[in-house]
């Protein structure tokens, strides 16, 4: 199993950012290494970390996304805020000091650049548009996603969409989900 430093060396050695150069971990190692990296402190508030949070939902990845560049040690209140979308992946990645995040595969397929992914995508793979509405992502029908959006007061901002495309970031919301 490679360490965080080894993953960074691999990235530097090949001269480009390769998020998948980070090794795929078991669930147990994902949690252990996440907590070790943060010294058991929440990366957002500095409190006691109790959850190894997937920055982007693990269901978005065919392999489960158990890589350290998709992990953040969070306390319970910050974990809840991250799950319901009040703390964004962009903010969490910055707090972790990660400059090579693991973007969900559907982001590239939709034509999103890494910076657009970080700026506009929530934990569940939905796109937040410039007008504040939300273009549903591939997990929109997932019970966990819908419960999180509802708990965060964001479910009413979603509109029904066909294909998930990068053009949805700035396009007007024709129909919003009621």
Task: Please place each PLM-identified region on the residue numbering.
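Histidine-centered nuclease catalytic patch
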Residues: 41-73, 82-93
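A boundary/linker detector
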Residues: 1-39, 46-49, 88-178
């Amino acid at each position: 199993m490679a360490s965080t430093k080894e993953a960074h060396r691999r990235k530097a050695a090949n001269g480009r950012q390769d998020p998948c150069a980070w090794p795929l971990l078991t669930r147990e190692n994902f949690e252990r290494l996440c907590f070790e990296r943060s010294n058991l402190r929440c990366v957002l508030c500095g409190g006691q970390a109790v959850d190894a949070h997937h920055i982007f939902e693990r269901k978005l990845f065919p392999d489960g996304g158990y890589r350290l560049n998709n992990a953040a040690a969070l306390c319970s209140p910050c974990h809840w805020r991250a799950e319901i979308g009040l703390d964004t992946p962009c903010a969490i990645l910055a707090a972790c000091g990660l400059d090579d995040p693991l973007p969900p595969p559907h982001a590239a397929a939709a034509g999103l650049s890494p910076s657009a992914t970080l700026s506009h995508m929530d934990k569940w793979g939905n796109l937040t548009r410039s007008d504040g509405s939300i273009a549903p992502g591939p997990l929109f029908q997932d019970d966990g996603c819908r419960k999180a959006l509802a708990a965060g007061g964001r479910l009413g901002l979603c509109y029904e969409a066909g294909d998930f495309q990068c053009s949805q970031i700035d396009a007007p919301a024709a129909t919003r989900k009621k």
